[in-house]
A protein has these predicted regions:
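Glycine-rich beta-strand-centered segment in the early N-terminal region that forms part
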Residues: 29-43, 57-111, 137, 156-158
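Glycine-rich phosphate-binding loop and adjacent beta-alpha segment
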Residues: 229, 267-330, 370-371
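A generic alpha-to-beta junction signature in SAM-dependent methyltransferases
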Residues: 183, 252, 264, 276-278
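Short N-terminal strand-loop motif that marks the start
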Residues: 1-75, 141-146, 371
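NAD(P)H dinucleotide-binding glycine-rich loop of Rossmann-like/cofactor-binding domains
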Residues: 83, 104-194
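C-terminal hydrophobic helical "lid"/dimerization subdomain
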Residues: 1-8, 271-275, 318-371
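Conserved amphipathic alpha-helix within the SDR
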Residues: 244-254
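Mid-domain Rossmann-like dinucleotide-binding core that forms the NAD(H)/NADP(H) cofactor-binding site
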Residues: 151, 157-241, 246
């Protein structure tokens, strides 16, 4: 059996104040029979990490951030033999991890398919406090401990860059599944995606793998719109350079989009999305994982007169992770350059630079290495 030499200490990144992360040494935690220790390979920076870095909305301090990570099992509790879907786990396997449901609330007891709505669930990398730091419960470090009850997936058949995109792709896969509750996707449907950051571009990729032939990407950055084209957008609209509402109407023969996905965290954008959608159309809001403020809309023009069907989307269910893996593999097979979204990689010691690069909007998905 493969055995790994594990040092006595490992580096951990700790958010200690607004826009201040320190890299510190902590003893490698012991694991119980129900826990797993992972050597981190790399972790994507999420918009939520950046919000925390800037001091909003939760202001979790101190905390070790990072929830889009992947790595190698180097120590395995004797009771942990299979992943969430029954795939065998062993030392050396590559893994990702999702939610850690509480197992006690009504959702966990009576509606296990919707563990993402667990009343007391945790996401590794968003667990504040000194205990979580000493447990290495975030992915921005050299090692990461998956506590008992954490959802684990064996993804040894995927390369490291593809694995790094599984968590955000699970977010958009869940949004597509929610959208199916209010919209019947057809190959000829006009599907509009507002916001071409990593989430919007991964959603675009997901919709493209569904065979949708009329994808409209809306953003104010030409570089991001170029990426939208690379990933399969049929039409692009730059709202900074043209009358975006008129352009969308022209593309859709005067009707408007059949289905719209709102992927930004901008309250203004959350209002504008309704203007793009046809009468009888549908919309899914997935851009607000933090409270960025209120928006305004006209109840007559935006809802009643159009009878727009609306749904919201929140994180993901366990099934969405498996679907996300399939989406990424298919995208790669189709030649869609999805791993090109990982535009910058930084060593652990330069995590503050990585955060500031993300804030500058110069890249797409910024990655922190576990070394």
């Amino acid at each position: 059996m493969e055995k790994y030499e594990i040092p006595e200490t490992g580096r951990v990144t700790v958010l200690t104040g607004t826009q201040e992360i320190k890299v510190v040494e902590e003893p490698i935690p012991e694991i119980s029979d129900d826990e797993v220790l992972v050597k981190v390979e790399q972790t994507g920076i999420c918009g939520t990490d950046v919000h925390e870095y800037k001091g909003d909305p939760f202001h979790y301090i101190p905390i070790e951030l990072g929830h889009e990570g992947t790595g190698t099992i180097v120590k395995l509790g004797k009771n942990v033999t299979k992943d969430y879907y029954g795939k065998t786990l062993k030392l050396g396997d590559k893994v990702v991890t999702g939610l850690r449901p509480c197992g006690e609330c009504d959702t966990c007891k009576y509606d296990a398919e919707h563990i993402h709505l667990c009343e007391h669930g945790e996401i590794f990398g968003l667990i504040p406090g000194e205990e979580a730091i000493k447990n290495m419960n975030g992915w921005f470090g050299e090692y990461m401990k998956i506590n008992a009850g954490g959802v684990i997936f064996n993804v040894s058949d995927m390369d490291v860059d593809l694995r790094t995109l599984i968590e955000p792709t699970a977010v958009v896969v869940h949004a597509v599944e929610k959208a199916k509750e209010v919209f019947n996707f057809k190959h000829g449907s006009y599907v509009l995606i507002q916001g071409c950051g990593p989430i919007g571009l991964l959603l675009l990729t997901t919709v493209r793998t569904m065979g949708i032939r009329n994808i409209i990407a809306v953003d104010g950055d030409n570089n991001r719109l170029e990426w939208a084209k690379k990933l399969g957008a049929h039409y692009t609209v730059n709202f900074m350079e043209e009358d975006a509402i008129r352009k969308v109407k022209d593309i859709t023969n005067g009707r408007g989009a059949d289905m719209g996905f709102q992927c930004t965290g901008s309250p203004k954008a959350a209002s504008t999305i309704f203007k793009y959608i046809r009468r009888g159309g549908s919309m899914c809001e997935l851009g607000f994982f933090t409270n960025n403020g209120d928006t305004t809309y006209n109840p007559h023009l935006d809802f009643c007169n159009k009878e727009i069907k609306v749904t919201g989307s929140w994180t993901y269910q366990a099934d969405d992770w498996v679907h996300a893996m399939d989406v990424l593999k298919e995208a790669q097979e189709r030649g869609l350059p999805v791993t090109g979204l990982l535009t910058h990689k930084y060593p652990l010691a330069k995590i503050n630079e990585a955060m500031k690069m993300n804030m500058s909007m110069q890249g797409l998905k910024i990655v922190v290495l576990g070394e």
